[in-house]
Amino acid sequence: LSRWPQATVLHQPQRQGKTAALNRGMKFVKTPLVIFTDANTHLNREALREIVHAFANPKVGCVAGEKRIAVQSKDNAASGGEGIYWKYESTLKALDSRLYSAVGAAGELFAVRRELFEDMRTDTLLDDFILSLRIAMHGYTIAYCATAYATESGSADMQEEEKRKV
């Protein structure tokens, strides 16, 4: 951390979950836009620039990036199926966004206007979806930005995928 003196570490000794950490951390944010990613994702070089550009429209309250699955092997059914699912999901988000607004954002990569963030219950599941949907309920759109993408490895096998989801 000494390489980034401008970084602020918000240590919390008790484990309270991701949603509690988001609620707490947002109280320290000073910028007008907040970009969220998962720790296990790799962003494309232009992702941040592209996602911020989408906020030029004042009606946009949230921008959803694209999730991509890196398939390591063609015979890996788990990651292959996951990759197909996310391509389908991305197509739906792109079409919804062109029509009016995407429905929800995936936690791998999305951004919100800071003033639209509302604390969530700490037992919230799918915090990314709930946060983006609340913003849409306030009359803002969720833009989909395929040129801002996050890539993550797929599951090694079906057992690993089941552990992640259950």
Name the predicted role of every residue range.
Residues 14, 25, 31, 39-41, ...:
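Short acidic donor-binding/metal-coordinating loop in glycosyltransferase active sites
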Residues 37-54:
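Acidic donor-binding/catalytic loop of UDP-sugar-dependent glycosyltransferases
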Residues 34:
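Short aromatic/hydrophobic "clamp" motif used to bind/position activated sugar donors
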Residues 25, 84, 100-109, 114, ...:
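Glycine/small-residue-rich pyrophosphate-binding loop that anchors the diphosphate of NDP-sugar donors
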Residues 20, 40, 46, 91, ...:
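Active-site phosphate/pyrophosphate-handling residues
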